[in-house]
């Protein structure tokens, strides 16, 4: 039974009044800050530079400091930090000296989830899209969920929102094992892949055990929703001592997809569920990986009693998430135009999924990728996979690695990647020097009908809007909101 919308009583955190975020502009921090502002807390935060994110929070009443200084935290009752913050940060040092609690962002998220029906989405890939789909379907079902997402939900114009119902939908971050703070009622595991292995001391078995531990944070009456198509998820399934529902393309899955048809940006498929009528579904996203994300959403929505009509409406009306195969528009070139796409994918599995989606939706079009590796350690650890996957583009331009605070690692840079990809003999990648303007470099390489993807988790995210505004692409047509 879907509950009626009632304003949910909002619990208070004891003596806590003023909450300070160190690195408030970060994608994992700003959403929690926004929800706390809407709950009536005083929120302040610091970051190295102002941004549209910090300006948005400021407009809601947050006090924003540019730069990290000890005095910024002086009046806080608690500091919230991410794993990216150095323990020597002056604000953290001041808080510790004054015995002001310093908590990880996941612990604050867990506090928000404590008195709610929490739905936590975990997995190496697909967390943001699945969480966003859930928010869309729950809203279509007459629920008004609180959500905290690692990307900007296009329809809401934000990555977080305070709802009136008991539901809180959030991403569960395995990168620093902080998802172990969460105690949800429903947990999703989309997949388990080798990433952030420094957290797990390079031990993949430790990573798998941590996911099992996360699932055992569920109460005995909770629900684990697990992707049966992922071999590692399938492997840990017998270890999970909680009620489970599986999904995937596998005939063994409780909820599965058949008859998948992709037409450009739209994917249509039939959903089979045990003891239910088949359900015809469409999503405005390409690729089988997004079918899996939709199946996880359908599994939870079905369990929560959301009607099939609302499920179909929430999925078909979903307008996407920022930087997840986000179509910016059309760039004019001789004889026609090029579709410009921005994408966050920064792991070989994610890059491969995007390439497969493009080949499936636009089989006759060339694929031009501007790729920026993210972190030297990831480039080193997954080097051979990157060489294999990136070599499947028709044209490849490689930006230098975005360090994300890391020091360079010999042999794990983009020049070396170019060399290794070139040696495969399939294509000759172009290395982009730091500071080089992209538009003059990429325009001569483009042909009418191409798909140009700017991909990665670093500052490559600013390239698509730059290209749309470049005089070399005068007359570029912005993608209209759906």
UniProtKB/Swiss-Prot annotation:
Top enzyme category: ligase
Key word Cell cycle present: yes
GO cellular component: cytoplasm
Keywords: ATP-binding, Cell cycle, Cell division, Cell shape, Cell wall biogenesis/degradation, Cytoplasm, Ligase, Nucleotide-binding, Peptidoglycan synthesis
GO molecular function: ATP binding; UDP-N-acetylmuramate-L-alanine ligase activity
Cell compartment(s), UniProt: Cytoplasm
EC number annotated for this UniProt entry: 6.3.2.8
Annotated S-S bridges: none
Top-rank taxon: Bacteria
Annotated ATP binding sites: 123-129
Keyword Nucleotide-binding: yes
Pfam families xref list: Mur_ligase, Mur_ligase_C, Mur_ligase_M
Pathway annotation: Cell wall biogenesis; peptidoglycan biosynthesis
Catalytic activity, as annotated: UDP-N-acetyl-alpha-D-muramate + L-alanine + ATP = UDP-N-acetyl-alpha-D-muramoyl-L-alanine + ADP + phosphate + H(+)
InterPro entries: Mur-like_cat_sf, Mur_ligase_C, Mur_ligase_C_dom_sf, Mur_ligase_cen, Mur_ligase_N, MurCDEF_pg_biosynth, UDP-N-AcMur_Ala_ligase_MurC
One Gene Ontology biological process: peptidoglycan biosynthetic process
Family, as annotated: Belongs to the MurCDEF family.
Described purpose of this protein according to its UniProt entry: Cell wall formation.
Protein name as it appears in the record: UDP-N-acetylmuramate--L-alanine ligase
The organism of origin for this protein: Pseudomonas putida (strain ATCC 700007 / DSM 6899 / JCM 31910 / BCRC 17059 / LMG 24140 / F1)
Lineage start: Bacteria, Pseudomonadati, Pseudomonadota, Gammaproteobacteria, Pseudomonadales
Protein's gene: murC
């Amino acid at each position: 039974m879907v509950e009626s919308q009632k304003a949910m009583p909002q619990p208070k955190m004891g003596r806590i009044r003023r909450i300070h975020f160190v690195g408030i502009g970060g994608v994992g921090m700003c959403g929690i800050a926004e929800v706390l502002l809407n709950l009536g807390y005083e929120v302040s935060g610091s970051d190295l530079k102002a941004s549209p994110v910090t300006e948005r929070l400021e407009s809601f009443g947050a006090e924003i400091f540019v730069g990290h200084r000890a005095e910024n935290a002086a009046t806080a009752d608690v500091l919230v930090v991410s794993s990216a913050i150095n323990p020597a940060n002056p604000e953290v040092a001041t808080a510790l000296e004054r015995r002001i609690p310093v908590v990880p962002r996941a612990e604050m998220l867990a506090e928000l989830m404590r008195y709610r029906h929490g739905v936590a989405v975990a997995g190496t890939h697909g967390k943001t899209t699945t969480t966003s789909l859930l928010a869309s379907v729950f809203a279509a079902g007459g629920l008004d969920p609180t959500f905290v997402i690692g990307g900007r939900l296009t329809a809401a114009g934000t990555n977080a929102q305070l709802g009136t119902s008991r539901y809180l939908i959030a991403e569960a971050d395995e990168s620093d094992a902080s998802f172990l703070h969460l105690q949800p009622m429903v947990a999703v595991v989309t997949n388990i892949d080798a990433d952030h292995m420094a957290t797990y001391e390079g031990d993949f078995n430790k990573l798998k055990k941590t996911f099992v531990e996360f699932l055992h944070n569920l109460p005995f009456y909770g629900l684990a929703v697990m992707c049966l198509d992922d071999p590692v998820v399938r492997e840990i399934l017998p270890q999970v001592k909680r009620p489970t529902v599986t999904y995937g393309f596998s005939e063994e899955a409780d909820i599965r997809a058949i008859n998948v048809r992709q037409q450009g940006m739209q994917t249509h498929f039939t959903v089979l569920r045990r003891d239910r009528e088949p359900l015809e579904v469409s999503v405005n996203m390409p690729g089988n990986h997004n079918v899996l994300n939709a199946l996880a959403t359908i599994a939870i929505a079905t369990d929560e009693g959301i009607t099939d009509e609302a499920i179909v409406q929430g999925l078909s009306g979903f307008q996407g998430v920022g930087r997840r195969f986000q179509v910016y528009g059309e760039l004019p070139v001789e004889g026609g135009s090029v579709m410009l796409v921005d994408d966050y994918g920064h792991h070989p599995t994610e890059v491969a999924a995007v390439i497969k989606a493009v080949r499936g939706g636009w089989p006759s079009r060339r694929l031009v990728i501007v790729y920026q590796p993210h972190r030297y350690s990831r480039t080193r650890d997954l080097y051979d996979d990157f060489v294999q996957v990136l070599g499947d583009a028709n044209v490849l331009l490689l930006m230098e690695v975005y360090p994300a605070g890391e020091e360079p690692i010999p042999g794990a840079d983009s020049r070396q990647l170019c060399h290794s990809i070139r040696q495969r003999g399939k294509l000759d990648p172009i290395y982009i020097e730091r500071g080089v303007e992209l538009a003059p470099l990429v325009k001569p390489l483009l042909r009418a009908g191409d798909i140009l993807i700017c991909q990665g988790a670093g500052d490559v995210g600013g390239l698509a809007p730059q290209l749309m505004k470049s005089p070399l692409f005068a007359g570029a047509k912005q993608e209209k909101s759906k």
